[in-house]
């Protein structure tokens, strides 16, 4: 239960179809201020719906929390305290852990790399052993548990909505740093995050937005002298993913990547248009043949427990059991 009590809670329903608004009203009544969007405005649009209402109410600090995030009892209070004590910081976020592996880091800040035109999460999948700094000043943080000053919004605006989904928080943080304010990831504020929306499980929805908005970001902010290198990076990356998709029989993924690239270079933003997102056509044959080739398999986590768990679940879907192994070496 949250130990910090000096706050008001706004819940934004982003045009859900499962009866969530009625369920929230029935369970929480006046304890939360419910806002129901008439259409799905994406991650950034959903956040901004609530942020704009809260901003008009005059709050000095505003916070974004994803629906698939679970906050530690001190998460909100410690972010507020950190901002109170660090005037140079424009926004601060929790230290994020994997929901399915709570002892391992999902994000403790992110770097934006204009040398290789990518982002990097330095602490991804690291085990929490208590040796990390109390906080870090970083290029960007995840918006799944993020607090921002009202004065920061005055300078850089609300979250960029043209992305619809993905890269919106990265761009927001980039603008914060560019405006002369720091972005912090705070270790004393902890949150668990499922991160389910970023996995391809049904269709190529995450692939489209991740690729299009990745390209859009660097096209927008890369210095002119580096544009040729940037273009080479995009084309090489696209060739690799498309080639692998065609080779593995994942034609819809390859198609989505090419369409995302085309939309990006033509400046198309917002919600994906028609014929951009397709059902997955995953080719399971190579994996099934791998599992059938031996009587037993072992997985060495090698500090990547989340990936190891996904391999185990894949085998389980094929009807095979995989034994966990703590040896330094493993068969798989």
Question: Locations of the language-model features?
Answer:
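Glycine-rich, basic loop-to-helix element that forms the pyrophosphate-binding segment
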Residues: 36-57
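Terminal low-complexity segments of carbohydrate-biosynthetic enzymes
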Residues: 212-213, 220, 235-332
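Short beta-strand-to-loop acidic/aromatic patch adjacent to the donor-nucleotide binding site
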Residues: 59-70
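A conserved acidic beta->alpha catalytic loop
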Residues: 13-22, 39
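Short, acidic, metal-binding catalytic loop of nucleotide-sugar glycosyltransferases
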Residues: 1-6
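Active-site-adjacent helix/loop segment of glycosyltransferases
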Residues: 136, 182-265
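A short, conserved alpha-helix in the catalytic core of glycosyltransferases
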Residues: 139-158, 162-190
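Acidic/His-rich active-site region of diverse nucleotide-sugar glycosyltransferases
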Residues: 45-46, 70-156, 162
């Amino acid at each position: 239960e949250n130990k910090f009590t000096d706050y008001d809670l706004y819940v934004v329903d982003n045009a859900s179809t499962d009866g969530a608004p009625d369920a929230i009203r029935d369970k929480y009544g006046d304890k939360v201020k419910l806002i129901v969007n008439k259409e799905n405005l994406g991650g950034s649009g959903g956040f901004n719906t609530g942020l704009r209402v809260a901003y008009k109410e005059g709050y000095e600090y505003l916070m974004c929390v994803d629906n698939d995030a679970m906050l530690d009892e001190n998460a909100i209070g410690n972010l507020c305290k950190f901002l109170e004590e660090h005037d140079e910081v424009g926004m601060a976020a929790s230290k994020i852990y994997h929901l399915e592996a709570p002892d391992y880091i999902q994000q403790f800040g992110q770097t934006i790399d204009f040398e290789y035109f990518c982002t990097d999460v330095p602490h991804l999948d690291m085990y929490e052993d208590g040796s990390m700094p109390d906080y870090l000043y970083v290029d960007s943080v995840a918006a799944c548990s993020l607090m921002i000053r009202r004065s920061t919004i005055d300078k850089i605006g609300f979250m960029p909505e043209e992305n619809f989904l993905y890269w919106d928080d990265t761009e927001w943080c980039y603008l914060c740093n560019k405006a002369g304010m720091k972005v912090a990831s705070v270790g004393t504020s902890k949150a668990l995050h499922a991160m389910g929306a970023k996995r391809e499980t049904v269709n190529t929805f995450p692939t489209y937005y991740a690729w299009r908005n990745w390209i859009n970001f660097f096209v927008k902010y890369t210095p002119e002298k580096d544009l040729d290198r940037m273009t080479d990076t995009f084309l090489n990356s696209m060739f690799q993913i498309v080639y692998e998709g065609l080779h593995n029989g994942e034609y819809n993924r390859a198609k989505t990547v090419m369409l995302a690239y085309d939309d990006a270079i033509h400046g198309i933003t917002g919600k994906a248009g028609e014929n951009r997102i397709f059902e997955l056509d995953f080719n399971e044959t190579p994996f099934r043949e791998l599992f059938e080739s031996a009587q037993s398999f072992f997985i060495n986590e090698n500090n990547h427990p989340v990936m190891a768990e996904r391999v185990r679940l894949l085998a389980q879907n094929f009807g095979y059991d995989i034994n966990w192994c703590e040896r330094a070496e493993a068969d798989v």
